[in-house]
UniProtKB/Swiss-Prot annotation:
This is tRNA N6-adenosine threonylcarbamoyltransferase. The gene is kae1. GO terms for cellular component: cytoplasm; EKC/KEOPS complex. One of its GO terms (biological process) is tRNA threonylcarbamoyladenosine modification. It comes from Methanococcoides burtonii (strain DSM 6242 / NBRC 107633 / OCM 468 / ACE-M). It is found in: Cytoplasm. Gene3D superfamilies: 3.30.420.40. Transmembrane segments: none annotated. HAMAP family: Kae1.
Length: 335
């Protein structure tokens, strides 16, 4: 049975995990928490560099304590991108050192695809349309003709960053998304705001700015509610279009913003109307985590994909639709 150690560190979370084909065997996470404002890339990278050795040591100890030997690990996987360049480089350095130390192959994993594959692993989803929503990314994807094709995506910022930007302007503490959700539950009125869907793409920067301006004349609760309703309706609309276009019968929600219960409710209602199945992995697998990198690395390793050390550069703009999905049989579909 294949066993892979994976390291995630594209932004906030430094997380490492060891998985086999059945389950997550061990996992350790250290989260960067800024004193004020949003993420500071240099500080986040320093955090990851400071804690990387300790996280890996604790992970290997947990692995040994469960009766396993590091000699059983077949490969080291790491988040190659997309993400913050400084954070990616820090994690890549740790992964290279570990692979050389254990004399085992290295696997570079696309962070976005990691979210998709952990969702497919930990839910009954087989061939879903995926709504991937996180801080820096918002995309609608589905597997076709050997790749995860992007059917729609943000034209500017990710929904998570839009929520955080608005929350900071409203004086809410980080992370902003859960605070916005909390206040939205107490709303009594809808405030008209921009709704921007262009073809199959969406935009959030104008909505975030409009929501901040709306605080001058409306309650925080009503603005939070209206921001969520518009943003999530845009995401659900494009997901529904992709579902109709592809003819698929499953929707998978992935990424940290997927923890929002209102977004889940809206997607669930849409899927019910269309006769599609809706899947969400448990909360621990929604945000950035080492298990998703380890498991996707396992899939890649088992399909013959490894990465020479000399080619293991990171890519802060690494798009999921550039990755050959060698671990899923090509149905020879036509786009």
């Amino acid at each position: 049975m294949t066993t892979v150690l994976g390291i995630e560190g594209t932004a906030w979370n430094l997380s490492a995990a060891i998985v086999d084909e059945d389950d997550v065997i061990a996992e350790v996470t250290e989260t960067y928490r800024p004193k004020t404002g949003g993420i500071h890339p240099r500080e986040a990278a320093q955090h990851h560099a400071l804690h990387a050795s300790d996280v890996i040591e604790r992970l290997l100890k947990e692995y040994r304590d469960k009766g396993h030997s590091p000699e059983n690990i077949d490969a080291i996987a790491f988040s190659q991108g997309p993400g913050l360049g400084a954070c990616l480089r820090t994690v890549a350095t740790s992964a290279r050192a570990l692979a050389l130390s254990l004399d085992i192959p290295l696997v570079g994993v696309n962070h976005c695809i990691g979210h998709v594959e952990i969702g497919r692993w930990k839910t009954p989803a087989v061939d879903p349309v995926v709504l991937y929503v996180s801080g820096g990314n918002s995309q609608v994807l589905a597997h076709r003709a050997g790749k995860y094709r992007i059917f729609g995506e943000t034209l500017d910022i990710g929904i998570g960053n839009a929520l955080d930007k608005f929350a900071r302007g409203a004086g809410l503490t980080h992370p902003g998304g859960p605070k916005v959700e909390e206040y939205a539950r107490k709303a009594t009125n809808y405030v008209k705001m921009p709704y921007v869907v262009k073809g199959m793409d969406f935009s959030f920067s104008g909505l975030s700015t409009a929501a901040t301006d709306a605080l001058k004349d409306n309650s925080l609760e009503d603005v939070c509610y209206s921001f969520q309703e518009n943003a999530f309706a845009m995401l659900v609309e494009v997901t529904e279009r992709a579902l109709a276009h592809t003819g698929k019968s499953e929707v998978l929600l992935a990424g940290g913003v997927g923890a929002n219960m209102r977004l889940r409710e809206m997607l669930d209602l849409m899927c019910e109307d269309r006769g599609a199945s809706f899947y969400v992995p448990e909360r621990r697998f929604m945000g950035d985590n080492g298990a998703m990198i380890a498991y996707t690395g396992l899939l890649m390793f088992n399909s013959g994909t490894t990465l020479p050390i000399e080619n293991s550069h990171v890519d802060p703009s690494f798009r999921p639709d550039t990755v050959d999905v060698t671990w899923i049989a090509d149905e020879k579909e036509v786009l």
